[in-house]
Amino acid sequence: AVDCNTVKSDLVGCVGYLPSGTGNPTPQCCDGVVKL
């Protein structure tokens, strides 16, 4: 699992993370994120 605080503090803005069930990284990737 990816920690939401780690994702939010990442300066590249969630690159390398995807919201579960989608194919598009977003700034709101904290919800149900999975590591690529």
UniProtKB/Swiss-Prot annotation:
What name does this protein carry? Probable non-specific lipid-transfer protein
Q: What does this protein do?
A: Plant non-specific lipid-transfer proteins transfer phospholipids as well as galactolipids across membranes. May play a role in wax or cutin deposition in the cell walls of expanding epidermal cells and certain secretory tissues.
Q: Name one GO molecular function term.
A: lipid binding
Which InterPro entries does this chain map to?
Bifun_inhib/LTP/seed_sf
For this UniProt record, the keywords arranged alphabetically read as follows: Lipid-binding, Phosphoprotein, Transport
Q: Which domain of life is it from?
A: Eukaryota
Modification(s) after translation: Phosphorylated by Ca(2+)-dependent protein kinase.
As for family, the record states: Belongs to the plant LTP family.
